[in-house]
Amino acid sequence: GAVSPSAVEEALLREPEAEAVILPSPNYYGICSDILAIAEVVHRYGKLLIVDQAHGAHLKFFEGRLQEKYGIHLSFPPSAESSGADIVIDSTHKTLASFTQTAVLNVFGKRPDISAIEDKLQAVESSSPSYLLMASLDINADLMKEKGSLLVKKWQDNLSRFYEEAVSVEGLRIMKTEGLDPTKINLDMSAHGFSGNDLENFLMERGIFAELVSGNI
């Protein structure tokens, strides 16, 4: 589930020497933590907030987009970039269009020490980077700049259509919870005796491949 601001504050009280709070949001299921509230807590204690937004690189492009279509209301959680995080890591290859293994480290405000970050990166990065991978990041940035609005609109339309039609499938339960990213679709057919693996095999036979199977989801 989501990481609560109170849990973050409890952790900071237990570990007063900590210099930063690092947390993932959204998680693998698309559940987002309240980064805005967490950032307020973290900064009140004089710490940095680092968000691993590996599964949420797309959220920035959905901000402010509410959609009411096919009788379905879609709203999207805010990105960590817009919620006060100091450092945000986006795995652009997961939900955007860059090649596998690519990601972006975003730094905001004056709290992070840019020089220290650059020094640490030199210790872990290769001295022979893949220019193919780096080029794919540039291409992804250009794509989202030039066609991002159109692509996101089509994405929203497809999501609305899916959720509208899924309502008519007897026994199909779709996970709904506060802070859930609608682009992450969590299906449960246990009402018909389907386990998660059964549902995965059923979908695979029809050319649809699940990203994760866990229990009945």
Predicted regions span which residues?
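Conserved C-terminal alpha-helix-loop-beta "cap" of PLP-dependent enzymes
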Residues: 161-217
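Conserved PLP-enzyme active-site core in the AAT-like
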Residues: 1-176, 189
